[in-house]
Amino acid sequence: MNAPPAFESFLLFEGEKITINKDTKVPNACLFTINKEDHTLGNIIKSQLLKDPQVLFAGYKVPHPLEHKIIIRVQTTPDYSPQEAFTNAITDLISELSLLEERFRTCLLPLRLLP
């Protein structure tokens, strides 16, 4: 069969998680390739990027169902770098998800479902 080995969907070596390439087709844009991820992460990062008023375009694609990577394209205003927008989006997501986890744990404490 032509399917890749199962371990390829999650095994990742040092320094292979993300690559950043400048997009030469449009000004002030970058392509972020994130390995071993899928639509779940791509959509949440894209949505967070679009909340930033200095981001002109944010989109993602999965090149092929058998390739375990996503490509996120980000274009920003001239005074704001795509790398800075991406870093800010990730930082904001970490904060939001930490708050969600904290509130979830607070709701579960009265039910004694947590150790």
UniProtKB/Swiss-Prot annotation:
Gene3D superfamilies: RNA polymerase, RBP11-like subunit. GO terms for molecular function: DNA binding; DNA-directed RNA polymerase activity; protein dimerization activity. Its main location: nucleus. CDD domains: RNAP_II_RPB11. It is found in: Nucleus. Signal peptide: none annotated. GO terms for cellular component: RNA polymerase II, core complex. GO terms for biological process: transcription by RNA polymerase II. Belongs to the archaeal Rpo11/eukaryotic RPB11/RPC19 RNA polymerase subunit family. Component of the RNA polymerase II (Pol II) complex consisting of 12 subunits. DNA-dependent RNA polymerase catalyzes the transcription of DNA into RNA using the four ribonucleoside triphosphates as substrates. Component of RNA polymerase II which synthesizes mRNA precursors and many functional non-coding RNAs. Pol II is the central component of the basal RNA polymerase II transcription machinery. It is composed of mobile elements that move relative to each other. RPB11 is part of the core element with the central large cleft. This is DNA-directed RNA polymerase II subunit RPB11-b2. It comes from Homo sapiens (Human). The lineage of its organism: Eukaryota, Metazoa, Chordata, Craniata, Vertebrata.
